[in-house]
Amino acid sequence: MPKLVRVPERNVEHAYGVYLLSYEHRLIKRLRRDHQPTIHGQKSWESAYLMMDYLSHHPLPKKGQVMEIGCGWGGISVFCARKYGSKVLAVDLDPAVFPFMNVHSHINAVEIEHRCVDFSKIKGRELGQYQTIVGSDICFWDSLVKPLVNLATRALK
């Protein structure tokens, strides 16, 4: 697993070809004044790096369709768009995470579409449009396991 590389600007991490800002970065601090994520979307979680590592060893098709569920600040979405040229739809239940995701997509020079939706409400027909559906650290409550299993079942039909 590659080490995180600190770049000259404070509170910026570089790993797997993407830049992610820490909770203490000046842009993030500014965003936090107006946007307060409520569903664990207050930072980039370590599990995003684990997923990036996995996807580095199990490459996605170039320019494929990717949906990230529970995207938070969008680290995995940014990685897929940057490394594989994927067209990404980032989905989260908390609308307050999208300004943070937009900053990350901007500093990494990628475009990411996003939508505020409960992943248990996404229809199988829509899920079937994506070659890859990813998510990391999305079962932080026991009550999320069954809806996630149901999502996988709908996606595979």
Predicted regions and their residues:
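S-adenosylmethionine-dependent methyltransferases
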Residues: 1-157
